[in-house]
């Protein structure tokens, strides 16, 4: 084993300022920063793996709120540091920029700076425990907010002299971090990615709270990565290869395949860090791939059709490019783009040689790849011709604009906005109600084409899509120019029903796939048309959704209730909490039935700590008190099953740990505890939810509450006042927070693969909170 001792740890400077400006080190103090702390510790263990000294990493999220990261690497050095005169492991945990990665002999490649990460994590943790197994001994040291609270001490011996490794357990400090509760879903994705990129590394992940336990291990990680990334059927086998350039100490690994898809999905990494903006390695990959395939087509296929270009090679491509290099040069602090110039030539030559060889040795697969490129070229030419139809001679001339477009008078894009309105009826109301100076209206007939299932050549034949592209003025694909955008606000305005939601989704899919910069630069919005209209006498109020309606009913209903012992504002706040409690209960009832039992479990003190047999007896007594007939009841140590006859019919109820782990159950329990913080003596033993209903009924008495299904039901003035007037309206700006996750959602929900969508719907059907049928 290579010698890894205190002299390998280089020291730069102390930890001053980390707690004052944590965002400089972990990005932010919210969800992203919290999980970045985990990655920093895990990355150190992965670096041990890349150096060849670790093959197992265990990560545990504990019930106490801590994260434990354990590896079987060499263990951080414990001998006295030559310049700091304290144990080297203490230096690594307490001094910024102290780590083995500044010593080129310790780590040939690394994702970051060893010691920077773990010392920052220490500074931002209210408590951190370091345990090291090294040279037959087990060492331990504790820290609080980056400061040692104990000396490094020997607490035992290892089972064997060869056993080694480092364990870090840290508790995020809530006085610095806005969020301290880890989210398993975020971490799972990253750990799986790490296992893909490091053949033979076993990463085990456990969450004690949910008893989740997963292990990620791949013998041929990149090939599996490509296979798992494919959303549609693969047309070719997965091609994979790797190489090591000794001169630059750069390892290159590539895996790719072609799928029956129009979209490209190329992922690139440097030292396990995702380079989402690409860089020289990704450019080199595409250069080498294009050169090999285009050369093959030129030498082997005669065609009178359009010749493919590099752009055509990308259609249907799924690829992962992973580099491990000693001193990568990144552009910017985020490390999302590689700038090392020599990487382009290295990757390009390797990819060209390997793909050229594959095509020569596999004529059937070569023909499939060539035909895919030829079809893409043909479609590109058809799209080019179709695009010409959407171009105008003059960007602001109305002469070539769609006939259905009611344009605005202003020619200033900064103040101009266009409403994409569902149907001619609503379009008519919008045209009459708008401010003609700066508001344009484009009615859309029916549901537009689902672009996820269509090629661009077909998309550009769609009348509604052509009208939108022409109206926007910015073009599409390679002719796209955001400087020519005629409206800086594009507002989707649809009915508040299932069809309206579908049209919104189709439009969002179109914008995401073909006009993504409009979303990224904040030009696309969704109008929040009111769902309800409350009318009583001369009072007319428009309400956005059921929450707004309930709050309005509470605020106006209490005026008709004579209550002593509680102030009006306190009563209003209490009833809003009660409304939230009722909502959580009703959502739970959809899954578990018997609202009465759910309330009993939440509202009965210590009910959740009772033995299941004792709990069964209490529940049966409760149901019998309600005159429900118990038909069958069966309890084990862990669950209760019963059938009972209620006024609503025969009901089955199953009780086990799954109920108590439900987020909605926790929400209901939390809101009930909030209710109990109020003095409820004024109710005189009346049920709080019954009182809430009484208050709401007072507000409803003599009132007409209309639920809008369509914008066409509103007269032009109402539509203007509620949805289009800048002073009154509510708009939602579209944002893309996680590109990969967004891409996956559109592919799943809007693509032509039925089975994954069916499975998703079946898995999440009970989670639906607003179903319009």
Swiss-Prot record:
<keyword id="KW-0238">DNA-binding</keyword>
<dbReference type="Pfam" id="PF00986">
    <property type="entry name" value="DNA_gyraseB_C"/>
</dbReference>
<dbReference type="InterPro" id="IPR036890">
    <property type="entry name" value="HATPase_C_sf"/>
</dbReference>
<keyword id="KW-0413">Isomerase</keyword>
<feature type="binding site">
    <location>
        <position position="422"/>
    </location>
    <ligand>
        <name>Mg(2+) 1</name>
    </ligand>
</feature>
<dbReference type="GO" id="GO:0003918">
    <property type="term" value="F:DNA topoisomerase type II (double strand cut, ATP-hydrolyzing) activity"/>
</dbReference>
<protein>
    <recommendedName>
        <fullName>DNA gyrase subunit B</fullName>
        <ecNumber>5.6.2.2</ecNumber>
    </recommendedName>
</protein>
<dbReference type="InterPro" id="IPR001241">
    <property type="entry name" value="Topo_IIA"/>
</dbReference>
<keyword id="KW-0799">Topoisomerase</keyword>
<feature type="site" description="Interaction with DNA">
    <location>
        <position position="450"/>
    </location>
</feature>
<dbReference type="GO" id="GO:0046872">
    <property type="term" value="F:metal ion binding"/>
</dbReference>
<keyword id="KW-0479">Metal-binding</keyword>
<feature type="binding site">
    <location>
        <position position="497"/>
    </location>
    <ligand>
        <name>Mg(2+) 2</name>
    </ligand>
</feature>
<dbReference type="InterPro" id="IPR011557">
    <property type="entry name" value="GyrB"/>
</dbReference>
<feature type="site" description="Interaction with DNA">
    <location>
        <position position="447"/>
    </location>
</feature>
<dbReference type="InterPro" id="IPR000565">
    <property type="entry name" value="Topo_IIA_B"/>
</dbReference>
<comment type="function">
    <text>A type II topoisomerase that negatively supercoils closed circular double-stranded (ds) DNA in an ATP-dependent manner to modulate DNA topology and maintain chromosomes in an underwound state. Negative supercoiling favors strand separation, and DNA replication, transcription, recombination and repair, all of which involve strand separation. Also able to catalyze the interconversion of other topological isomers of dsDNA rings, including catenanes and knotted rings. Type II topoisomerases break and join 2 DNA strands simultaneously in an ATP-dependent manner.</text>
</comment>
<dbReference type="InterPro" id="IPR014721">
    <property type="entry name" value="Ribsml_uS5_D2-typ_fold_subgr"/>
</dbReference>
<keyword id="KW-0460">Magnesium</keyword>
<dbReference type="InterPro" id="IPR018522">
    <property type="entry name" value="TopoIIA_CS"/>
</dbReference>
<dbReference type="Pfam" id="PF00204">
    <property type="entry name" value="DNA_gyraseB"/>
</dbReference>
<comment type="similarity">
    <text>Belongs to the type II topoisomerase GyrB family.</text>
</comment>
<dbReference type="Pfam" id="PF02518">
    <property type="entry name" value="HATPase_c"/>
</dbReference>
<dbReference type="InterPro" id="IPR013759">
    <property type="entry name" value="Topo_IIA_B_C"/>
</dbReference>
<dbReference type="InterPro" id="IPR013760">
    <property type="entry name" value="Topo_IIA-like_dom_sf"/>
</dbReference>
<dbReference type="InterPro" id="IPR020568">
    <property type="entry name" value="Ribosomal_Su5_D2-typ_SF"/>
</dbReference>
<dbReference type="GO" id="GO:0005737">
    <property type="term" value="C:cytoplasm"/>
</dbReference>
<comment type="subunit">
    <text>Heterotetramer, composed of two GyrA and two GyrB chains. In the heterotetramer, GyrA contains the active site tyrosine that forms a transient covalent intermediate with DNA, while GyrB binds cofactors and catalyzes ATP hydrolysis.</text>
</comment>
<dbReference type="InterPro" id="IPR013506">
    <property type="entry name" value="Topo_IIA_bsu_dom2"/>
</dbReference>
<dbReference type="GO" id="GO:0005524">
    <property type="term" value="F:ATP binding"/>
</dbReference>
<dbReference type="GO" id="GO:0005694">
    <property type="term" value="C:chromosome"/>
</dbReference>
<dbReference type="InterPro" id="IPR002288">
    <property type="entry name" value="DNA_gyrase_B_C"/>
</dbReference>
<dbReference type="GO" id="GO:0006265">
    <property type="term" value="P:DNA topological change"/>
</dbReference>
<keyword id="KW-0067">ATP-binding</keyword>
<keyword id="KW-0963">Cytoplasm</keyword>
<dbReference type="GO" id="GO:0006261">
    <property type="term" value="P:DNA-templated DNA replication"/>
</dbReference>
<dbReference type="InterPro" id="IPR006171">
    <property type="entry name" value="TOPRIM_dom"/>
</dbReference>
<feature type="domain" description="Toprim">
    <location>
        <begin position="416"/>
        <end position="530"/>
    </location>
</feature>
<dbReference type="InterPro" id="IPR034160">
    <property type="entry name" value="TOPRIM_GyrB"/>
</dbReference>
<feature type="binding site">
    <location>
        <position position="495"/>
    </location>
    <ligand>
        <name>Mg(2+) 2</name>
    </ligand>
</feature>
<keyword id="KW-0547">Nucleotide-binding</keyword>
<dbReference type="Pfam" id="PF01751">
    <property type="entry name" value="Toprim"/>
</dbReference>
